[in-house]
Design a protein with these regions (language model features):
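Membrane-cytosol interface motif
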Residues: 62-67, 107-123, 296-322
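Juxtamembrane helix-loop transition segments at the membrane interface in multi-pass membrane proteins
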Residues: 52-61, 99-109, 287-306, 613-621
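Actuator/coupling domain of P-type ATPases
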Residues: 22-30, 35-118, 122, 134-141, ...
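Residue-level signature of catalytic and energy-coupling elements of molecular machines
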Residues: 51, 79, 100, 119, ...
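Bilayer-spanning, highly hydrophobic alpha-helical transmembrane segments
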Residues: 13-17, 225-256, 268-289, 570-599
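Cytosolic catalytic headpiece
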Residues: 110-111, 138, 306-517, 521-527, ...
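Membrane-embedded alpha-helical bundles of multi-pass transporters
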Residues: 2-3, 20-29, 48-54, 72-77, ...
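N-terminal membrane topogenic signal
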Residues: 1-14, 234
Length: 621
C-alpha cells in the first residue's frame, strides 16, 4: 500500500469504530447527531471538498457530488447513522479501487521495468556511473553481469548471454560477442561487455517502448469512449431524476388532498442517488483495457492504444507480406543437380566465383559450400546485371547465373521440377548443373495460420514480389487462402484497398509486415501489425501493433488477449447496468433502503474492479 492508501485505511477504521461506538451508546437527540458528525468528517472531508470545488468549477455532476448530496441529505433528515455508513462504505470501495488500480499499474511497471538507472563509463581506470541521457553517441560503456544494457550499441569487447524477455517475452537468453548489436532494456546474464553506443538514450529501443506504453492510454476504445459519454449524460440525468422523485410525488399528493410525505420521498431520492453512482463503470472499463495492454506487453506484443486492442477482436482478414513475416527472408540451398561432378564441387565452383558479391544469393551459396574462399584464386570477375556473373577460378572459366546467361553462352540448361530460385553453373563452357534456392519458411508460420483460423479469421492472404510458382508453393505449405505474387510496393497497396472493399460489414483487415518497407500498406490497413520490430524504430513508428520478435503465432495470441479483454469489459457493463437498474427501480418505489443502496454501490464497484484485474493475466492463458 502507498502512504496515501494507508492514511485512508486508518481514517476508515477510526471512523467505523466511532460510528459503532455512537450507535451502541445510549445517547439520543442532537448530541447523538453531533457525535456522528465527527466520524463523518474524518472519513468524508475530502469527498465534500471535491464536491464543493466541482460546484465552483461548474463540474458538479460527478460521484463526489452524488455522495455529498446523498449523505448530507440523509443526515439532515435525521438518518445520522445511515449518512455516516454511506460515506464509510463508499470510502472502503474507493480504497479497494485505488489498491486494485495501483496493483495493476505496478504489475505493468514490473513487466515493463526496462528503464536503466545508470550507465557505466570507464574514467581513470575506474567505472563511473552516469545518467544514460548524458551519454553521447559513440561512447564506450561497460555493462557488468546482472546489469541492464542502458543504450543501444555494438559490442566491442567481451562475450555474454543476454536476457531479452523484457522486450520479446521470450525467456531463452541470446549469446552476443564482439561485433553484435545489442539493445537497451536487455539484461547481461554473464560476462563483461564493452559496448559502443549507436544512439542517444532518447532514441534507443527502451525509450521508444516506454513512450509507446505510456501513451497507449491516450487512444481510447469505443467502449471507453461510450462510458465517458455515458457518464457525462447519465450523472446529470440521475440528479434531475432524484430531484423529480423528491418533489413531484409529494406535490401530486398535495393536489390530490393527501399528506405530501416529504421525508419519505426525499429519503427515496437520496437512496436513488447513492445507488446511481457510476463508479463501477467509470473505473473498471479503462482498468480492463489497461490490464489487457499490460498483459500483451508482457508477451512482447505492444498495442498502441485500447482502440487497436478492441479492433483486433473484430479482424476478419489478415494480409501477410511474405518475406520476413511468414518466411525468414534468408535464402537456403534446397537442392542441387550436378552434371559430371558431386554436389560439393558444384557448390565450390559457384561459391568461389561469387566470392566478391554481396547479393543474398551469393552469401547463401558461400554458406552452403562451407569452404574457405581464397580470393587470390579468383580473377576476371564480371557482374552482368539481370544475368549473373562470369569469372575465372584457378584459371577455369566459370559462369553462374540464370537461364538467360546460359542461353547467352550457348548452353541449354536442364530445368528443375521444383519451384524456387534457380542458379545455373557452367565451367569452361560446359553445363555443370543447377542449384535450387528458396526462402526458408518460419517454424511457427503454419501454426500461426491455423491459430488465426481458430480465432475466427475468415481469410488469410499473402502478398509477395516473388515469382508465382515459388509464392504458391509457400502459400500451399502454410495453408494460406489466397496469394498474389510478382507485386511492387504500390501493387501491395492496391491489393489491400481491393480487400478492404470486399470485407464483410463489421469486420476489419489487418496487414502484417516488417514495418520498414511496408509503411504505406501498414497505414492503409485497418490495423497495421509490424513483426520482428526489435530494434526497428521505423516499425514502432509505422504500426498500430508491434510484435517485438519474429514469431507469427503471436498475432493469434494478440487477438486472444483482445477477445478476453473485451469479454471482461462487456461483462462489467452488463453486470453494473443490470444491478443498478434493478436497484434504482427498487429505490424509487421505496423497497430499497439506504443500506441496500450502499451494498449495491460498493458491491458492484468491488466486483467490477476485481473482474477488470483479470485482464492483466489475459496473455498468460
Amino acid at each position: 500500500m502507498s502512504k496515501k492508501q494507508k492514511t485512508n485505511l486508518i481514517r476508515i477504521i477510526v471512523s467505523a469504530v466511532l460510528v459503532i461506538g455512537v450507535w451502541v451508546s445510549p445517547l439520543t437527540g442532537w448530541l447523538e447527531g453531533v457525535l456522528y458528525l465527527i466520524p463523518y468528517f474524518i472519513v468524508g472531508y475530502d469527498i465534500l471538498l471535491k464536491a464543493v470545488k466541482g460546484i465552483f468549477r461548474g463540474q458538479m455532476f460527478d460521484e463526489n457530488f452524488l455522495m455529498a448530496v446523498a449523505t448530507v441529505g440523509a443526515m439532515a433528515l435525521g438518518d445520522w447513522r445511515e449518512g455516516c455508513a454511506v460515506m464509510v462504505f463508499y470510502q472502503i470501495g474507493e480504497l479497494f479501487q485505488s489498491y486494485a488500480v495501483g496493483k495493476s499499474r505496478r504489475s505493468i511497471s514490473d513487466l515493463m521495468d526496462i528503464r536503466p538507472d545508470y550507465a557505466n563509463i570507464e574514467s581513470g581506470g575506474a567505472l563511473e556511473k552516469v545518467d544514460p541521457e548524458d551519454v553521447a553517441v559513440g561512447t564506450v560503456i561497460v555493462v557488468q553481469p546482472g546489469e541492464r544494457i542502458p543504450i543501444d550499441g555494438v559490442v566491442t569487447e567481451g562475450e555474454a548471454a543476454v536476457n531479452t524477455s523484457a522486450l520479446t517475452g521470450e525467456s531463452l537468453p541470446r549469446q552476443v560477442k564482439a561485433g553484435d548489436e545489442v539493445l537497451s532494456g536487455c539484461v547481461n546474464l554473464s560476462g563483461l561487455l564493452h559496448i559502443r553506443t549507436t544512439k542517444e538514450f532518447g532514441d534507443s529501443t527502451v525509450a521508444k517502448i516506454l513512450d509507446l506504453v505510456e501513451n497507449s492510454s491516450m487512444k481510447k476504445a469505443k467502449a471507453e469512449n461510450f462510458i465517458t459519454k455515458f457518464a457525462r449524460i447519465y450523472t446529470p440525468a440521475v440528479c434531475y431524476s432524484a430531484v423529480a422523485l423528491a418533489v413531484l410525488p409529494p406535490v401530486v399528493r398535495l393536489i390530490m388532498g393527501n399528506a405530501p410525505m416529504w421525508g419519505d420521498w426525499i429519503t427515496r431520492a437520496l437512496t436513488f442517488l447513492v445507488i446511481s453512482c457510476p463508479c463501477a463503470l467509470v473505473i473498471s472499463i479503462p482498468l480492463s483495457f489497461f490490464g489487457g495492454i499490460g498483459g500483451a506487453s508482457a508477451k512482447g506484443i505492444l498495442v498502441k492504444g485500447s482502440n487497436y486492442l478492441e479492433a483486433l477482436a473484430k479482424t476478419g482478414c489478415v494480409v501477410f507480406d511474405k518475406t520476413g513475416t511468414l518466411t525468414k527472408g534468408v535464402f537456403q540451398v534446397l537442392e542441387t543437380a550436378p552434371e559430371g561432378m558431386d554436389a560439393q564441387t558444384l557448390l565450390g565452383w559457384a561459391a568461389q566465383a561469387e566470392c566478391y558479391s554481396k547479393h543474398p544469393i551469393s552469401q547463401s551459396l558461400k554458406s552452403a559450400w562451407g569452404g574457405q574462399v581464397d580470393t587470390d584464386r579468383v580473377t576476371d570477375v564480371e557482374e552482368l546485371g539481370g544475368f549473373g556473373l562470369t569469372g575465372r577460378v584457378d584459371g577455369h572459366a566459370v559462369a553462374v547465373g540464370n537461364r538467360r546467361l546460359m542461353e547467352k553462352l550457348g548452353i541449354q540448361p536442364i530445368e528443375p521440377q521444383r519451384a524456387g530460385t534457380v542458379v545455373y553453373v557452367a565451367v569452361d563452357g560446359v553445363y555443370a548443373g543447377w542449384i535450387l534456392l528458396g526462402d526458408v519458411v518460419k517454424e511457427h508460420a503454419a501454426q500461426a495460420i491455423r491459430g488465426l483460423k481458430a480465432e475466427g479469421v475468415e481469410k488469410t492472404v499473402m502478398l509477395t514480389g516473388d515469382a508465382n510458382a515459388a509464392a504458391r508453393q509457400v502459400a500451399s505449405q502454410l495453408g494460406v487462402d489466397d496469394v498474389h505474387s510478382q507485386l511492387l510496393p504500390a501493387d501491395k497497396v492496391r491489393q489491400v484497398e481491393r480487400l478492404l472493399k470486399e470485407r464483410r460489414e463489421g469486420r476489419l483487415l489487418a496487414f502484417v509486415g516488417d514495418g520498414i518497407n511496408d509503411a504505406p500498406v501498414l497505414a492503409r490497413a485497418d490495423i497495421g501489425i509490424a513483426m520482428g520490430a526489435l530494434g526497428s524504430d521505423a516499425a514502432i513508428e509505422a504500426a498500430d501493433v508491434v510484435l517485438m520478435d519474429d514469431d507469427p503465432a503471436k498475432i493469434a495470441l494478440a487477438m486472444r488477449i483482445s477477445r478476453r479483454t473485451l469479454r471482461i469489459v462487456y461483462e462489467n457493463i452488463v453486470f453494473a447496468l443490470a444491478v443498478k437498474a434493478v436497484c434504482l427501480v427498487l429505490g424509487a418505489i421505496g423497497i430499497a433502503n439506504m443500506w441496500l443502496a450502499i451494498g449495491a454501490d460498493v458491491g458492484v464497484m468491488v466486483l467490477a474492479v476485481l473482474n477488470a484485474t483479470r485482464a492483466l493475466s489475459a496473455g498468460k492463458e
